Amino acid sequence: MNGERLLACIKQCIMQHFQPMVYDESRCVIETTRGTFPVPDNYKKYKTLAFAFVGHVLNTDDTPVIEKELDWPDPALVYNTIVDRIINHPELSQFISVAFISQLKATIGEGLDINVKGTLNRRGKGIRRPKGVFFRYMESPFVNTKVTAFFSYLRDYNKIASEYHNNTKFILTFSCQAYWASGPNFSALKNVIRCSIIHEYISKFVEREQDKGHIGDQELPPEEDPSRELNNVQHEVNSLTEQDAEADEGLWGEIDSLCEKWQSEAEDQTEAEIIADRIIGNSQRMANLKIRRTKFKSVLYHILKELIQSQGTVKVYRGSSFSHDSIKISLHYEEQHITAVWVYLTVKFEEHWKPVDVEVEFRCKFKERKVDG
């Protein structure tokens, strides 16, 4: 980490979300876009802490204009909050030392009462551990090592608790292109995301019209369990294409062509609706569409399990939802301390809808419990 990034992380711990404000020394007030706040005497030598507290108020009070008189805590409480954020910041943990904290106190908290305990979020009850840890890895030299380390800790509550101080919420964001810099996996993921989105669009239009007119009295085959493993992903895709071509080569060929190109959301919806009109009312085509949709979901979930290094022990929990360029998938882990997992796969583009990356956002929640041993 260079000096500029280190300073940015420390500033983030002082004020988690930037708020424009000015300290008027002539009037001893802090002016903001949402109000003016008189600074009490015990904060006049701790301007950084005064800014941090006002920033905390602005972030936690939704009132457009704050007119009430603030209940300013002891400055040491604000200082404790900043230290707590720094200690638990994922990018700063390696820099924390006695000398670092001593220098921090000499800079922004010299002379504070060391007997004051707690933070702004929990006064008088000891240092509060933040309930969220956020990671973002987008550069090739770091992604694979960092992401692999995170997933190796994920299933072991003792490791997570000791490494991340009993946090219960994690958001890991990383570049798939950097994670899978070589090999077929990255390309396969981009392609199956596109195929899944197109089939979701078409199915949405078909189901909407089916609900209106109760079309398709013939029972369709039940949807396959998308979480089962596929031994050979490429074989599944190839056999799928051959099977559908036998039913209606022209129609499925058009869908395949649409899957091969990225374009605007409006263009996708227009073409998907036109194709859906040719499927509605034809029970065989509707059945084949459902098979295709299920197969692409299976391929997607198979690749996703490889991506999060969880083959065979993770199940799709509440299905998935989609937008024009992203898919959200809910997962269920067998470990009891992992209570909820959502994975967001978002395609990133250059000009002319050229896909260049898939940004992965892995969100999980834990159930806090005692550490073994």
UniProtKB/Swiss-Prot annotation:
Transmembrane regions: none
Keywords: Nucleus, Plasmid, Plasmid partition
Mutation effect (residue 184 to Q): In strain: ATCC 44827 and ATCC 7754
Annotated region described as Interaction with REP2 and self-association, given as residue ranges: 1-129
Region (Nuclear localization): 349-373
GO cellular component terms listed in the entry, alphabetical order: nucleus
Effect of substituting residue 93 to Y: Abolishes interaction with REP2, but not with STB
Listed InterPro entries: Rep_fungi
Region called Interaction with REP2, residue ranges: 1-76
Further facts: The plasmid 2-micron circle is a extrachromosomal element that resides in the nucleus and propagates itself stably in host cell populations. It provides no obvious advantage to the host but imposes no significant disadvantage either at its steady-state copy number of 40-60 molecules/cell.
Assembly information from the UniProt record: Interacts with REP2.
Name recorded for this polypeptide: Partitioning protein REP1
Species: Saccharomyces cerevisiae (strain ATCC 204508 / S288c)
Encoding gene, per UniProt annotation: REP1
